[in-house]
């Protein structure tokens, strides 16, 4: 998973479902729930301001209770049984996406290896790698660090999946298809941080001590998953993350490669990682498709909830030990560099909507499920409109970029346009 992978886009975070226009009473949607509101004119002089605030608090509390009840429903025996019944299907359709160890690439396949090149050949290859790396601009280097730091936080992601009900690896060596998938996926993901770390070390362009501290901080910070333990939401989240990571690494490969800045070694590394992520995306996308077939109403509501809140980036607590707004800087730099953009976010949503055939869902949907389906299908266009408006506001405001030092690259300055 890459840092730019789900920058979750502040624009997307502001989006909410449309009010229900079929009701005779005014309504609004909170957390995907319709709540009938009493217009301020009806309160008028009869109710004091404090009473209005108290009523609003009661409404919010009711919404939270309803949401909590819905989240608990995803952990009911009936819902978890859906995952248990999928075990033979996972064995047949998901586990084959893992490659045998002997057929899998390793970091030493992509970078200079003294065991293959010998001492002199290794040093010559490292010198060539450093020469090529010298042409990569600092803006892309910062984005690369963010991606690498996120990949290195794999322990956080594996522990999160192991907490998911009905699929977690409870003993650490369970023989279930779900548990074997999690361990196999983690083993393949482990190479991503390793190969990026090794490239960065050999290139000489990075202050590796500062980069390593960033990794340390991120793993130590952990990641709160919302909602916790729900397999429906966990697989939607991971499918999106894997797709976004593939896009981010693929974009980076193109930007630094022969048609970009001429660093063939880095392009090869990023392209290889991107191919892995696409394979992993296929697995999680298949799982969500299967859930939507087995339980369309709960499945589409889980998709809507995750997208409505914005797919939270796993590295939002990323830190350099100095700037409180580092995450915002990384998001903006990724947009500027083109490694991961709002347009990419929209394209990913559209891709998953097509893959999961969300628009075709009808049978078995409740009213809430239909609203969730419509929200998901309309979301990309909403984000694009908000992006256009945000751009117009930025042009009018005539904001200027600021120059900030980044300790990952020896405090060299990069120019960033913050929101």
Curated annotation (Swiss-Prot):
Fe cation 1 binds at residues 151, 189, 192, 277. Its EC number is 1.14.19.-. Binds 2 Fe(2+) ions per subunit. Keywords: Chloroplast, Fatty acid biosynthesis, Fatty acid metabolism, Iron, Lipid biosynthesis, Lipid metabolism, Metal-binding, Oxidoreductase, Plastid, Transit peptide. Pfam families: FA_desaturase_2. It is an enzyme of class 1 (oxidoreductase). One of its GO terms (molecular function) is metal ion binding. One of its GO terms (biological process) is fatty acid biosynthetic process. Pathway: Lipid metabolism; fatty acid metabolism. The keyword Chloroplast applies. It is found in: Plastid, Chloroplast. It comes from the Eukaryota. CDD domains: Acyl_ACP_Desat (cd01050). Its main location: plastid. InterPro entries: Fatty_acid_desaturase-2, Ferritin-like_SF, RNR-like. Fe cation 2 binds at residues 189, 242, 277, 280. Gene3D superfamilies: Ribonucleotide Reductase, subunit A. Residues 1-54 form a transit peptide. Its cofactor is Fe(2+). One of its GO terms (cellular component) is chloroplast. PANTHER family: ACYL- ACYL-CARRIER-PROTEIN DESATURASE-RELATED, ACYL-[ACYL-CARRIER-PROTEIN] DESATURASE 6, CHLOROPLASTIC. Belongs to the fatty acid desaturase type 2 family. Introduces a cis double bond in the acyl chain of an acyl-[acyl-carrier protein]. This is Acyl-[acyl-carrier-protein] desaturase 6, chloroplastic. It comes from Oryza sativa subsp. japonica (Rice).
């Amino acid at each position: 998973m890459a840092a730019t992978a789900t920058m979750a886009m502040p624009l997307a975070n502001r989006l909410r479902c449309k009010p229900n226009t079929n009701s005779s009473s005014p309504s609004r949607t909170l957390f995907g729930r319709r709540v009938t509101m009493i217009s301020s004119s009806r309160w008028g002089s009869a109710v004091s301001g404090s009473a209005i605030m108290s009523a609003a608090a009661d409404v919010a509390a009711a919404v939270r209770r309803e949401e909590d009840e819905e989240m608990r429903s995803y952990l009911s025996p009936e819902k978890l049984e859906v995952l248990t019944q999928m075990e033979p299907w996972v064995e047949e359709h998901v586990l084959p996406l893992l490659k045998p160890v002997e057929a899998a690439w390793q970091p030493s396949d992509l970078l200079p290896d003294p065991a293959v090149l010998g001492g002199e050949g290794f040093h010559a290859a490292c010198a060539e790698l450093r020469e090529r790396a010298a042409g990569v601009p600092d803006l892309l280097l910062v984005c690369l660090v963010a991606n690498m730091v996120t990949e290195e936080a794999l322990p956080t992601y594996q522990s999160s999946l192991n907490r998911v009900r009905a699929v977690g690896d409870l003993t650490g060596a369970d023989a279930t298809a779900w548990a074997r998938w999690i361990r196999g996926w983690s083993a393949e993901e482990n190479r991503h941080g390793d190969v990026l770390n090794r490239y960065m070390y050999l290139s000489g362009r990075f202050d590796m001590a500062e980069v390593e501290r960033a990794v340390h901080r991120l793993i130590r910070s952990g990641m709160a998953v919302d909602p916790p333990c729900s397999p429906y939401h966990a697989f939607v989240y991971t499918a999106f993350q894997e797709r976004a990571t593939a896009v981010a690494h693929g974009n980076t490969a193109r930007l630094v490669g022969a048609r970009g800045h001429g660093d063939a070694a880095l392009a090869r590394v990023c392209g290889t990682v991107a191919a892995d992520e696409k394979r992993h995306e296929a697995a999680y996308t298949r799982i969500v498709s299967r859930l939507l077939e087995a339980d369309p109403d709960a499945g589409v509501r889980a998709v809507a909830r995750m997208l409505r809140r914005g797919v939270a980036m796993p590295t939002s607590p990323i830190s350099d030990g100095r700037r409180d707004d580092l995450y915002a800087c990384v998001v903006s730099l990724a947009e500027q560099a083109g490694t991961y953009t709002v347009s990419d976010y929209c394209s990913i949503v559209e891709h998953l909507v097509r893959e999961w055939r969300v628009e075709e869902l009808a049978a078995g949907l409740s009213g809430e499920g239909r609203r969730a389906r419509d929200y998901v299908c309309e979301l990309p266009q909403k984000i694009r409109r908000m992006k256009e408006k945000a751009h117009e506001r930025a042009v009018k405001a005539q904001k200027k970029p600021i120059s900030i030092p980044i300790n990952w690259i020896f405090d060299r300055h990069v120019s960033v346009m913050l929101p």
